[in-house]
């Protein structure tokens, strides 16, 4: 992929209102369950990013007819489990860790062989955390010697339900086991050490599949059916996080974000920002298809450093690049622990964010499972590298609001995986962003 670099002008404020793209986690799951359902599923508000498009491409390769996307609308003509067909090629999910881990569980119970692969970044990420519990259910999946993709899934093995306790809180692993559990004999129960996003459980019930929860354990019984339905995807709070931080740190900002996913397993970023002193107001709430949504108003505020409670870490795991920028602009010191998972995301987010913040003149002390950041009133400018991580690129774009010189960001092309139109939205809300690369083809 041709590289794309950004140059973001220093200073400014954000005004107006916006609806960020649809939630990536919910978009993936809606396509997957729609394909496995009996009947037709109509999805609106879907994220048209590269990751979700990769999931759509996988199911087309498995014989599912899917219309769209067109302006966030997709129609999935479900074929049931029995209607899936052997693909004629490897199933390439690009940069999408969600696709790979959830599909590993979904494909494990099929009667034919499949191969899951991704781009160079994804094929370096750890996959044993999902293949090992699937093997306990009877799945036969081979990885590289390092435990990474490609995943070769040998079909035809009968699966049996298990009781499994996650060693590390992971919604992706939980979801993979529940998807495999639908094809398994008996009950599959997954116990979490800490709460994680529960979109899979909510959506299974929305498609008519019974799921039970008792405290930290979620269970389902194999052999039930899914039924096509309508899914209205809320705006992605992980994408909204960049704008919540941006409006918080830029003096004079006043921004309203519409129809943001307000699932309580995803609102850790708002809780952390509020503890730092952010002015975030819930204007209204609603529930759409079993998922809570909210309109949020955020105004600039003087942030202060805090020790981030470890119990909030799994509820904000994807939002820490944005939160690191908030910490860099806060008065005092912010401490993060219990977040070793950040080292095995699309990049080593602890190391890469620390490197970039140090380039901007911030005092940062990276640790094995977290970081110490000393905030300052004004950031320096400079050139940082995103390491092709979409959330790193967007975080440093936001940092320019408190910089004294332009911030240049290398390798921003993967922002299209989660937030197509990010640059255009920043410009509309009042920021100055220049792009060098393929952005003019409408892919950023």
From Swiss-Prot:
It is an enzyme of class 2 (transferase). Keywords: Amino-acid biosynthesis, Aromatic amino acid biosynthesis, Cytoplasm, Transferase. The active site is at 318 (proton acceptor). Disulfide bonds: none annotated. PROSITE patterns: EPSP_SYNTHASE_1, EPSP_SYNTHASE_2. Transmembrane segments: none annotated. GO terms for cellular component: cytoplasm. It catalyses: 3-phosphoshikimate + phosphoenolpyruvate = 5-O-(1-carboxyvinyl)-3-phosphoshikimate + phosphate. Phosphoenolpyruvate binds at residues 24, 97, 125, 172, 349, 391. It comes from the Bacteria. Its EC number is 2.5.1.19. InterPro entries: Enolpyruvate_Tfrase_dom, Enolpyruvate_Tfrase_sf, EPSP_synthase, EPSP_synthase_CS, RNA3'P_cycl/enolpyr_Trfase_a/b. Pathway: Metabolic intermediate biosynthesis; chorismate biosynthesis; chorismate from D-erythrose 4-phosphate and phosphoenolpyruvate: step 6/7. The keyword NAD does not apply. GO terms for molecular function: 3-phosphoshikimate 1-carboxyvinyltransferase activity. It is found in: Cytoplasm. Coiled coil: none annotated. One of its GO terms (biological process) is chorismate biosynthetic process. 3-phosphoshikimate binds at residues 24-25, 29, 170, 172, 318, 345. Belongs to the EPSP synthase family. Catalyzes the transfer of the enolpyruvyl moiety of phosphoenolpyruvate (PEP) to the 5-hydroxyl of shikimate-3-phosphate (S3P) to produce enolpyruvyl shikimate-3-phosphate and inorganic phosphate. Monomer. This is 3-phosphoshikimate 1-carboxyvinyltransferase. The gene is aroA.
């Amino acid at each position: 992929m041709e590289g794309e670099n950004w140059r973001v002008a220093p200073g400014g404020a954000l005004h107006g209102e916006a609806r960020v793209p649809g939630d990536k986690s919910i978009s993936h799951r809606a396509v997957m369950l729609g394909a496995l359902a009996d009947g037709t599923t109509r999805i609106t508000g879907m994220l048209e990013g590269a990751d979700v498009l990769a999931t759509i491409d996988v199911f087309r390769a498995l014989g599912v007819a899917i219309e769209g996307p067109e302006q966030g609308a997709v129609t999935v003509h479900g074929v049931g489990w029995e209607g899936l067909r052997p693909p004629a090629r490897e199933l390439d999910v690009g940069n999408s860790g969600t696709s790979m881990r959830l599909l590993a569980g979904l494909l494990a119970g099929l009667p034919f062989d499949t191969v899951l692969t991704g781009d160079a970044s994804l094929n370096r990420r750890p996959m044993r955390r999902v293949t090992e519990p699937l093997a306990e259910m009877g799945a036969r999946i081979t990885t590289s010697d390092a435990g990474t993709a490609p995943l070769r899934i040998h079909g035809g093995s009968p699966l049996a339900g298990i009781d499994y306790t996650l060693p590390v809180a992971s919604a992706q692993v939980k979801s993979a086991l529940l998807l495999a559990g639908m094809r398994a004999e008996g009950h599959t129960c997954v116990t979490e050490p800490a709460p994680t996003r529960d979109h899979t459980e909510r959506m299974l019930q929305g498609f008519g599949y019974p799921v039970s929860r008792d405290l930290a354990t979620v269970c389902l019984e194999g052999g039930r059916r899914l039924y096509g339905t309508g899914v209205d995807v809320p705006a992605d709070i992980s994408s909204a996080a960049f704008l919540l931080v941006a409006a918080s740190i830029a003096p004079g900002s006043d921004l309203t974000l519409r129809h943001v996913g307000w699932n309580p397993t995803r609102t850790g970023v708002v809780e952390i920002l509020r503890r730092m002193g952010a002015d975030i107001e819930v204007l209204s709430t609603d529930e759409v298809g079993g998922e809570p949504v909210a309109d949020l108003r955020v105004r600039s505020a003087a942030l202060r450093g805090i020790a981030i409670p470890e119990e909030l870490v799994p509820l904000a795991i994807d939002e820490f690049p944005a939160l690191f920028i908030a910490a860099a602009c806060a008065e005092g010191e912010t401490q993060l622990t219990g977040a070793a998972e950040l080292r095995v995301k699309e990049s080593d987010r602890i190391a890469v964010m620390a490197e970039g913040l140090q380039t901007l003149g911030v005092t940062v002390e990276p640790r094995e499972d977290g970081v110490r950041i000393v905030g300052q009133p004004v950031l320096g400018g400079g050139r940082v590298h995103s390491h092709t991580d979409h959330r790193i690129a967007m975080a440093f774009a936001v940092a320019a609001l408190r910089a004294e010189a332009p911030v240049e960001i290398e390798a921003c092309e993967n922002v299209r995986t989660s937030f197509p139109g990010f640059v255009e939205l920043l410009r509309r809300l009042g920021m100055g962003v220049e792009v060098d690369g393929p952005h003019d083809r409408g892919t950023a």
